[in-house]
Amino acid sequence: MHEAFTIEQLPQSWQEQLKDEWSQPYWSQLLTFLKSEYANATVYPKKEHVFSALRSTPFDQVKVVILGQDPYHGEGQAHGLSFSVPKGQALPPSLRNIFQELQADLGIRNETGCLQTWADQGVLLLNTVLTVRAGEAFSHAGRGWEHFTDAIVTKLIQNRTHIIFVLWGSAARKKCDLLFQTKHQHAILACPHPSPLAAHRGFFGCCHFSKINYLLKKQGKPMINWKIA
């Protein structure tokens, strides 16, 4: 069980940034909790997918950060990337709204909800909490994952420059509070969450996808191809 959550599961660049987390008290408590949960309940995503966001987008390759909250809690949906579902899965409401905004913004129409190609291009699709019990949203909140993902965000803010932080909703903004408290060389795009409850309050019409590519082009970096084949 613990082998699934060792530092060796991460790319070298993330290992160097996060090595101190494995010796923190919260980490051993989190591992004990996860061992019990995976043994006695159905937990998403599968253990081998929990660190998919970090494996897909190494620290030194992060160009954009899109923060989610906790994984989808339906069967077969969560695979370690925020907002993403495996190919063949129906689009959850928030992702459907994300794709609706993408089409309105750039005319790109996506049919499949697997965002792996975005991650491969430098978009870190990170949830605040990395696991969840089946059918119980936020069931693994407050168990330690927040400390771990806080460390990820802090390392990116402090040890990288010119990252585009995409903050959809108040939880993502709060997670990146350090961006609003310190001087830095990052860009911030913020608007309401794409969930059906909030999307009409300013997510639709935010044009974040074209703005991301405008900023990347300005930085001399390759733009993101948002089209999913």
From Swiss-Prot:
User: Which keywords has UniProt assigned to this entry?
Assistant: Cytoplasm, DNA damage, DNA repair, Hydrolase
The entry lists its GO molecular-function terms as: uracil DNA N-glycosylase activity
Function description? Excises uracil residues from the DNA which can arise as a result of misincorporation of dUMP residues by DNA polymerase or due to deamination of cytosine.
Signal peptide annotation: none
Q: InterPro entries attached here?
A: UDG_fam1 (IPR002043), Ura-DNA_Glyclase_AS (IPR018085), Uracil-DNA_glycosylase-like (IPR005122), Uracil-DNA_glycosylase-like_sf (IPR036895)
Q: What is stated as this protein's family in its record?
A: Belongs to the uracil-DNA glycosylase (UDG) superfamily. UNG family.
- Enzyme Commission code: 3.2.2.27
According to its UniProt record, which residues of this chain constitute the active site? D70 (proton acceptor)
* One matching Pfam family: UDG
- UniProt GO cellular component terms: cytoplasm
Which Gene Ontology terms describe the biological processes this protein takes part in?
base-excision repair, AP site formation via deaminated base removal
Q: Which NCBIfam families match?
A: PRK05254.1-1, PRK05254.1-2, PRK05254.1-4, PRK05254.1-5, ung
Q: Which SMART domains match?
A: UDG, UreE_C
Reaction catalysis annotation: Hydrolyzes single-stranded DNA or mismatched double-stranded DNA and polynucleotides, releasing free uracil
For this UniProt entry, what is the primary localization, expressed as one broad class? cytoplasm
SUPFAM superfamilies assigned to the protein according to its UniProt record, in alphabetical order = Uracil-DNA glycosylase-like (SSF52141)
Localisation: Cytoplasm
UniProt protein name: Uracil-DNA glycosylase
Identify the HAMAP family for this entry: UDG
